[in-house]
């Protein structure tokens, strides 16, 4: 596979990966809840539905629920329906991808707590769902997480060329053309040389036309285009050497050359060859996100090995570099367990300045992690707020001029990143001497540290 690791990820793709993480996080949160009785509501509204119709349906359900014999369960169901109706009133119109509403009374830490969550997914909801149960139903949200990357295919032999895309299970033929190339000639002498030259010219023109057509089909151009490939990767298939010549042709756009994932020898051309190429490229297509992840982490570890001073890792150094706006690519494990905890205390009747710590959930209940030396005295701090660090990154990474890259621990490189580097790191815009930065931070307050930034970059 020859995807260029230096090729920047488009903002649209980055936003999509963040939206996928947010959806996974929402699903995990919903699935962790246990309803108090059979009274929690799962409501999924696909685009095209009228909010007034959904509100009318909930009104009817309210009337039906009023006949529930159990007083406790009846009140819980009525309360959940009321919460759902109140949440719908916040929307003047249905969001383009539809709306998911989850509400009801759950059991959490031995207490009953009301939960109301409304969520607009990054992909359209397909079916209308209304369920009242003892748990939140997330099956239909999970369906949205199925791989929807779009891949391009160029199937090319000496008779025809087919260009197509594959997205999930949807196969779309974009273009199909035939060619009549001169056959090898059996004559000798000057005729042989002339026919060989004509044959080579015809093959060259054929490859040129295919390259030009591929450039126009697989790159979003024009006044409203992004000038980027419209596919995540390209598969080149064929029964002769045409695909190899195409992949190195100067006419074949560099932006497409950089995303060629695999070249496949197949027995057929046209649509039959397209189907065979899909089958033979199955493992490559399945692991494309993983391959991109491995390339990113390889770049990360190579910077460490070469001591370029353009890389950071661990929470302390990464946060420090992020606050300096030195981080170009913020790399985080998508299951990073740390929380960003805000702590304060009252000293001599005055509230102290907020202290930020990065703690595991288990550490947040241990007093030894909630102590801090303030004005020369060690004091016990109170938790004023906490947020999953990943959520804080999603909310704030743009403020520091960074891109946000999620990685998993499904590869050897990902496992090493999580266990060896704490699951968090970054590629830097400029060199930073982190040892000098740490020493300087200990000797200076934050303001003077930022003023003298040039001392260690």
Swiss-Prot record:
Record keywords, A-Z: Cytoplasm, Protein biosynthesis
TM segment ranges: none
Pfam families reported in the protein's UniProt record: eRF1_1 (PF03463), eRF1_2 (PF03464), eRF1_3 (PF03465)
Family annotation (InterPro entries): eFR1_2_sf, eRF1_1_Pelota, eRF1_1_sf, eRF1_2, eRF1_3, Peptide_chain-rel_eRF1/aRF1, Ribosomal_eL30-like_sf
UniProt GO cellular component terms: cytoplasm
Primary location recorded for the protein, binned into one broad class: cytoplasm
GO MF annotations in UniProt: translation release factor activity
Location in the cell: Cytoplasm
NCBIfam families with a match to the protein in the record: aRF1_eRF1
Family in the record: Belongs to the eukaryotic release factor 1 family.
Function: Directs the termination of nascent peptide synthesis (translation) in response to the termination codons UAA, UAG and UGA.
Subunit text: Heterodimer of two subunits, one of which binds GTP.
Protein name: Eukaryotic peptide chain release factor subunit 1
